[in-house]
Regions:
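N-terminal secretory signal peptides that target proteins for export/translocation
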Residues: 1-13
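Bacterial N-terminal signal peptides
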Residues: 16-33
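Active-site bordering "gate/hinge" segments
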Residues: 29, 37-394, 399-402, 408-411, ...
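Short clusters of small/polar residues that mark proteolytic maturation junctions
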Residues: 281-283, 417, 518-519
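Hydrophobic alpha-helical bundle architecture
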Residues: 390, 450-528, 544-550
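His/acidic/aromatic-lined binding-pocket segments of jelly-roll/cupin-type domains
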Residues: 404-405, 506
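C-terminal, non-catalytic macromolecule-binding modules
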Residues: 413-467
Length: 595
């Protein structure tokens, strides 16, 4: 099952990629009642807490309560139909977090979170309570006991399942009423695909045995580096390691358990130019264990580079809106493809009255230059020795992760599918993903862009200068790093995207040195932007981040080479009017942070 991030994220038509947007980084630095139609209450167990070894207590309770609910919920008539599908998805995660700011530890904790998402479907796969705008009526979420007490877990599941049935029944009755008065839908696909049950080895629950003391020292030292840069007035260094096991059982017979292990170090810093523009830099390092994160020397070098970059950005000129040639670095290109292309290839975007359906009717048609191919492969845990955040073994509907070739030689082949069918693709391909508390939808995992027209990056730079000269432009742009972006995909908004760069240079055609600039966002429409790609570099780069959409925030990766585009449009960034701090900071000490 996909790694599930246990935190709330508001559903929105904006799709955000990245460790965080600039606004989110700055923020870090600075049920209606239902009638319950109850299943029988579970019988009391004679065994107490810890009577069953993990995961037997949890998995046993899931199996038992699922079977009881399927046999006893509903009366089988039109007013109280029996469920045709029921599933329990449990996220069981232990995490250790250490944070430092201004050279001192501000947080050092270990936490254990166990949540269940219960999905109840009434009607039939052809049409059920999730139809149309009622998709979330199938879902009920709640915390589960952390102890392996089968009685406590069973009672929690019993209560939540009853709530879930009431919610599903309310949605089902609304769907039936609406179908009598609405016009025929353009896409008459079913609401739930038919899939083969999946089983995997049942794994032990998560365990985490880590000494936080060495990491308290490491994050303290890294945070203290920013004291050398008086204009950097906000910083945060956070280390987190998570051990997670996700369980999925369904009335179809699926029974899977998927482990997840991730260690992440995030370094963030904030400054402000004299004109009030906020400036943010962030670096994220990820591995499958703390031992595989970069050593302290490498991290210190990166931290110093961030401080120097912010100092330079404060003095850089604000660039004007631009429409002309540009190079996006590999990381920048990866975010670009994630936002501009990836979201529009998610299955649920191909049906419904609200979606713009940019590529819905273009299967088998060319949508990219013929030298580009795009796949999404969540089965890859790493690439060239670097961890990929978008890796998972089973998705959040219990389907095995699969490589999906989305575009071959520029031609669109398929979409990223959950178990919500669309007219052109009726089956899941293992991309039904969700954050805890959200309904799964088709989402990206590891989006990988490859090119058959790759040149060394020095040659790509020469091609940029030549293209700028051809267009009579005094310079082209080079986007070195990008923080985040979003895409608008609904019909009631422009079919547009915005990508937020952090480091941008003007590359002059007359031989002048490259000039660092600030205050620019990349904007545009997807088809125009994608068809302006002229060539790519010969080295792939990786972007690891978190992406938010209607099914919540999920970990993603995008892999791409640098690319040259003939036309890219930029606009001025929003600029604040707050002054930098008037009072100078206290003098830095000579040590490595507070003890």
């Amino acid at each position: 099952m996909a790694h599930r991030i246990p935190r709330t994220h508001c559903a929105t038509p904006l799709r955000v990629a990245g460790a965080a947007s600039a606004a989110a980084l700055l923020a870090l630095l600075s049920a209606p009642p239902h009638t319950v139609i109850a299943a029988a209450e579970p019988a009391a167990s004679s065994a107490g807490a810890h009577s069953l070894a993990a995961p037997a207590a949890l998995v046993g309770a899931l199996d038992t309560e699922l079977k009881r609910a399927m046999s006893s919920l509903g009366k089988g008539d039109d007013k109280e139909p029996k469920p045709y599908f029921l599933s329990y998805a449990v996220s069981d995660a232990i995490a250790a977090t250490v944070s430092a700011q201004y050279g001192a530890v501000v947080n050092s904790v270990q936490s254990h979170i166990r949540n269940v998402d219960i999905q109840v479907r009434l009607g039939s796969p052809a049409q059920d309570n999730t139809h149309g705008d009622h998709r979330t009526s199938a879902l009920t979420s709640m915390p589960l006991p952390l102890t392996d007490d089968s009685t406590a877990i069973s009672r929690s599941l019993w209560y939540a399942t009853n709530r879930g049935y009431a919610r599903a029944l309310d949605g089902y009755l609304k769907v039936k009423t609406e179908q009598q008065v609405r016009a025929k839908e353009e896409d008459t696909s079913a609401d739930f695909s038919s899939e083969q049950p999946q089983t995997s080895k049942l794994l032990a629950g998560p365990s985490l045995n880590i000494d936080r003391t060495p990491w308290e020292q490491r994050v303290r030292e890294l945070s203290h580096i920013f004291s050398q840069y008086p204009d950097v007035f906000g910083d945060m260094v956070q280390f987190q390691v998570t051990d997670e096991t996700d369980y999925f059982v369904s009335s179809e017979g699926s029974r899977t358990a998927t482990p997840g292990h991730v260690a992440r170090l995030v370094i963030m810093a904030h400054s402000r130019a004299a004109d009030g523009m906020d400036l943010v830099r962030a670096e994220t390092f990820e591995a499958d264990s703390p031992a595989h994160l970069p050593d302290q020397k490498v991290l210190a070098e990166k931290t110093n580079a961030m401080g120097k970059s912010l100092e330079a950005l404060r003095e850089a000129p604000v660039t004007q809106p631009f429409n002309g040639p540009a190079i996006l670095s590999g990381r920048a290109s990866a975010v670009f493809f994630h936002e501009v292309l990836g979201h529009r290839l998610e299955g649920q975007r191909q049906r419904g009255d609200e979606e713009g359906q940019t590529f819905t009717k273009l299967l088998g048609k060319q949508i990219l230059p013929t030298f580009l191919s795009v796949a999404d492969d969540p089965t890859l845990a790493s690439l060239n020795g670097h961890a990929l955040s978008g890796h998972f073994e089973f998705d959040d509907e219990g389907e095995p992760a699969r490589r999906v070739d989305l575009i071959k030689n520029g031609v669109l082949q398929t979409f990223l599918m959950s178990r919500l069918p669309v007219a052109s693709v009726q089956q899941s391909n293992g991309h039904g993903r969700a954050e805890v508390g959200h309904m799964p939808t088709g989402r990206q995992g590891n989006l990988i862009v490859t090119s058959s027209k790759a040149v060394p990056e020095s040659e790509l730079r020469a091609m940029l200068i030549a293209e700028a000269k051809r267009q009579n432009k005094p310079y082209g742009l080079y986007f070195e790093d990008i923080s985040s972006g979003f895409a608008l995909t609904t019909r009631n908004s422009p079919q547009a995207f915005q990508v937020i760069p952090l480091v941008v240079y003007r590359v002059y055609v007359d031989g002048r040195p490259d000039e660092l600039v600030r205050g620019v966002n990349i904007v545009g429409t997807p088809q125009a932007a994608l068809n302006s790609i002229l060539a790519t570099g010969d080295k792939q780069d990786i972007f690891n981040g978190v992406c938010g959409a209607e099914s919540g925030s999920v970990a993603v990766s995008a892999v791409a080479p640098a690319m040259l585009v003939s036309q890219i449009e930029t606009q001025r960034q929003r600029q604040g009017n707050a002054r930098p701090p008037i009072l100078p900071p206290p003098p830095p000490d000579s040590g490595k942070g507070a003890k």
